[in-house]
From Swiss-Prot:
Chemical reaction(s) catalysed: (2R)-3-phosphoglycerate + ATP = (2R)-3-phospho-glyceroyl phosphate + ADP
Residues reported to bind substrate: 23-25, 38, 61-64, 120, 153
Taxonomic lineage: Bacteria, Pseudomonadati, Pseudomonadota, Alphaproteobacteria, Hyphomicrobiales
An annotated GO BP: gluconeogenesis
Leading EC class: transferase
Protein name according to UniProt: Phosphoglycerate kinase
Family per record: Belongs to the phosphoglycerate kinase family.
SUPFAM superfamilies, sorted: Phosphoglycerate kinase
Assembly: Monomer.
HAMAP family linked to this entry: Phosphoglyc_kinase
Organism: Mesorhizobium japonicum (strain LMG 29417 / CECT 9101 / MAFF 303099) (Mesorhizobium loti (strain MAFF 303099))
GO cellular component: cytosol
Chain residues that bind ATP: 203, 325, 355-358
Length: 398
């Protein structure tokens, strides 16, 4: 049994008003949605609730409006895109509380789907204001949270509502939580983590948490340079946070105490400038020229990472191994991603990945669909990896 209530526990909802918190923070250009992935992810929950005769009312934020309602942050164009994905009409109410919202709900029939306007048009939303939560709850009988990506925020539409109405995890939220449980909560060992990206400073909490939970930690990207420098390696003109060398040393000490192997690059792809087609060479990590920048890990390191992926039963991945946006500095990330995907498809690996750059890198490698689970949740995924409580999830627990 899941530790949280899901749609399997919801009972008879025919004719009930179900408020569903969803993630509709999708890219929009010229009034049109350019990537509907997040809408596609919530479609099963909406279809299931609607099919059971519920009146489905969608709650979401969009962007970061500063001073109340603003046309550029309206969800109205997204209602149209949601209707296209669902293949059915989706109503739109130009407020999320008050008379306009109430009258739109009153006009609903069983199975109808309605999208409320941006919850962040009210400052009270982000303050988790109890009075605002009650105004939202007035339009619902049941609350379903299907927005894991907003679960790290204690807002009225994520945490406040769940305190006022019977609350359940939607199918997207459920899938995310079950995947994360396999990744770090209760994983099959050995567990290997790959952490890349530019800076150690943004991932200190993440690294400190992981060394206590995984058997091996592969460090790549610009952040590997900070660890190499902490070990006394000259990294030339590579991106490096020299002031964080003591932090990197402390992470390595804690890893040793916890029995977690730290895997750092033994060679690197070096160039004098960061641009497409720049002249580059692979050198041992001890031979980085003074005017060179490490922009990817080298072939020997790729081989080592592959060997660790072969040993792993579970892989957790956040961040690219090199500057994957520009060829040929995408080689290591693509090679490791394809290797992990092949192991996953063969049934030998549980692979969980997340974070914006990571998703982009796996898409670039063409293997995002072959991983066990790829989280699009951004900040919530990172906070989960950091071992921090997620208010929007905790409130759904049985």
């Amino acid at each position: 049994m899941a530790a949280f209530k899901t749609l399997d526990d919801i009972g008879n909802i025919s004719g009930k008003r179900v408020l569903v918190r969803v993630d509709l923070n999708v890219p929009v250009a010229d009034g049109k949605v350019t990537d509907a992935t997040r809408i596609e992810r919530i479609a099963p929950t909406i279809a299931e609730l609607s099919g059971k005769g519920a009146k489905v009312i969608l709650l979401a934020h969009f962007g970061r409006p500063k001073d109340g309602p603003s046309p550029e942050f309206s969800l109205e164009p997204i209602a149209r895109a949601t209707a296209e994905v669902l293949g059915r009409p989706v109503g739109f109410a130009s407020d999320c509380v008050g008379d306009m919202a109430g009258s739109a709900v009153a006009a609903m029939n069983k199975g109808d789907v309605l999208l409320f306007e941006n919850t962040r048009f009210y400052k009270a939303e982000e303050k988790n204001d109890p009075a605002f939560s009650e105004r939202l709850a007035a339009n619902g009988d049941i609350f379903v949270n299907d927005a894991f990506s907003a679960a790290h925020r204690a807002h009225s539409s994520t945490e406040g509502l769940a305190r006022l109405l019977p609350s359940f995890a939607g199918r997207t939220m459920q899938a995310e939580l079950e995947a994360l449980e396999k990744g770090l909560g209760n994983p099959v060992r050995p567990v290997v983590a790959i952490v890349g990206g530019a800076k150690v400073s943004t991932k200190i909490d993440l690294l400190m948490n992981l060394v206590k939970k995984v058997d091996a930690l592969v460090i790549g990207g610009g952040m590997a340079n900070t660890f190499l420098a902490a070990r006394g390696t000259d990294v030339g003109k590579s991106l490096c946070e020299h002031d964080l060398a003591p932090t990197a040393k402390q992470i390595m000490i804690e890893a040793a105490e916890a029995g977690c192997a730290i895997i750092l690059p033994v060679d690197g792809v070096v160039a004098k400038e960061f641009k497409a087609g720049a002249a580059c060479e692979t050198v041992a990590i001890s031979d980085v020229p003074a005017d060179g920048m490490i922009l990817d890990v080298g072939e020997k390191t790729v081989k080592t990472i592959g060997e660790w992926i072969d040993r792993a039963a579970t892989l957790v991945w956040n961040g690219p191994l090199g500057a994957f946006e520009i060829e040929p500095f995408d080689h290591a990330t693509v090679a490791a991603a394809k290797h992990a995907a092949a192991r996953t498809k063969a049934g030998k690996l549980v692979s969980v990945a997340g974070g914006g750059d990571t998703v982009a890198a796996l898409n670039h490698a063409g293997v995002a669909d072959d991983f066990t689970y790829v989280s699009t949740a951004g900040g919530a995924f990172l906070e989960w990896m950091e071992g921090k409580p997620l208010p929007g999830v905790d409130v759904l627990k049985r």
